[in-house]
Amino acid sequence: MVSQEFKASVADKNLLRTRIMLKDSFVVDPTLAQFDEMLSYASGHLPDLFTQFDGEYLENDISKWNRDVMNEELVRLVTNFSKTRIDHLKKVVSKVLETEAAKIRKKRTEQST
């Protein structure tokens, strides 16, 4: 569900705040469901939401993915909100926060039955 606060940020065309809220949703909901919903909403209203990929290094060695790498990538996302970085970060978050995401999915399943 997209919050009223997020909708207000998008309506105000506040790119920085919108990007920060999107970034934060990676950690709040590591299933990425919230991020995907928020991104869909924002990209439909903010044509300048995405930037070009800056070409900076992306850690592709899965064995090195940990919270430190994830946090570095989250910080970089705010200033380089590119589709390339988002796609990479989705993979990193899915791996690093795999346990947390599983707990959330289980809870959602239990609540829906």
Regions picked out by a protein language model, each given a short descriptive name:
Residues 15-16:
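TPR-repeat structural position
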Residues 3, 19-51:
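Short, charge-rich amphipathic alpha-helical segments embedded
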Residues 43-65:
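Alpha-helical linker/edge segments of TPR/alpha-solenoid repeat scaffolds
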